[in-house]
Amino acid sequence: MRLPEISIWKVILLLHLFALQEFQLVSAANLPSLSSSTKAADSSSKGSSSAKTTTSLGKSSVTSKDVSSSHNVTSSTKMPKITTSASTSLYTNSSLWSNNSVISTSSITPSSVYIPVTDGNKFLYQAHHPNGTVFIAFAGCLGAILLSLTGAWIALNIKSWRSARKENKLRNLENQYQHDPFYFQTNINDDESETSSHSDDSDISEKVLKNNSSRMSLYTLGSTSVLNLLNNKTDANDNFRSSMFISPTEILQSDANNSNTWSQSNESAIYDSLSSTPREPGATQILGKFTDSTNPFNYTSYNLSPDSEDRSTPKSNVSQGKVKKYRPPSVHLDQLLDGKE
């Protein structure tokens, strides 16, 4: 569907017709018509403009007379006359009265705010504290806490250092006096140099003890090196009995292998010199010296054996040529061994 072509002139003509109809409606309502004119600020140019319109509709007519350039609005009707005037003064107020109508204009000039001086004013509070008091107090508390922690850390380190130094001295004394220099074939100075290399250790236990090639055995106190060190010649039987440890099975096992060791060695060579370091005698060597009469484990000499009434077992052993050097302390073990034989 094709729309009809409308020219611009037709549109303008329709707009004029609508404006004319509105003007006629206003005139029919007996409303005043307003006309305004502007006057230039220059005093040399005094141009004026006037407009005169006349319309007739039926029997009523409205005529607008001349309107000058002084912002005057006139009408033939009995409407009030409104006159406005503007002044360039900053502190002037103007009001005009015309037929019970008032229009007033006002103007305000901006001004700067005056701040009074606080020096010497008794009505104002004067602050005497320095700026940043809260931050200064917080920093002081934090510094006190850090300083106390640092002091406690230093005190604990000094205390631990003193305790470690004291333990090191005790360890040196232990290595110097509790070891047998003749048995271990080492000097005291070597022990001190060895312990000084481990001065960083705080306990006296494992590292120093593990570095030694050998330690004191159960029979060290009964060894001949201790006798040489103390320069005291005591009986081997007393040295053996000074130990509280008794192992019958160990005695029986080592007796078979080392039965002739004590007889081959010279007993006087043990006590010959203090400078020599003889080998520590074994338990079988000490016990091999004992006879049946002096053996502390021979319970038959004290009539403590339950088979003391029955002399068949010892007699049979003597008759067979199997004479025991000693008897074990356990009667039950003795019966088991006799049963095996």
Swiss-Prot record:
GO cellular component: cellular bud neck; fungal-type vacuole
Comp. bias (Low complexity): 35-70
InterPro entries in alphabetical order: PRM
Region Disordered: start-end pairs: 35-78, 272-291, 298-341
Record function comment: Appears to be a structural component of the chitin synthase 3 complex.
Record-given protein name: Chitin synthase 3 complex protein CSI2
Species of provenance: Saccharomyces cerevisiae (strain ATCC 204508 / S288c)
